[in-house]
Amino acid sequence: MRAMVLDDSRTVRLIIGKILAELGIDVVEAGNGREGLERLREHPGLELVMVDWNMPEMNGLEFIQAVRADRAYDPVRLVMVTTETEQEQVMRALDAGASEYVMKPFTKEILIAKLSMLDIVGES
């Protein structure tokens, strides 16, 4: 399996990337939504995107909306990983097409459990 970690924080990209790599998932990185869309085009086999909400240029919600507007990306699972904790934010992300929602800070165990719910763990 191949995934992208989309977050403007290099530290967060490294943390999530390390967890995914431990699960046998190949990872590419992007620092904002526009760069994330470029990576999707450059890496057509991506099956999962872990996406932050608050990023410069194009935020995570806008990224999810752009991805879901293109039917070619229907199989891509989009997991919002963010500090946004309000129920309204959660619903906006899910309504836009997020497959799952993970609130920061998170533990490795929570992240793996969320990925298991999407049948990602063990797929690699």
Feature annotation, model-predicted:
Residues 44-50:
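Active-site beta3 strand of CheY-like receiver
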Residues 106-115:
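C-terminal output helix
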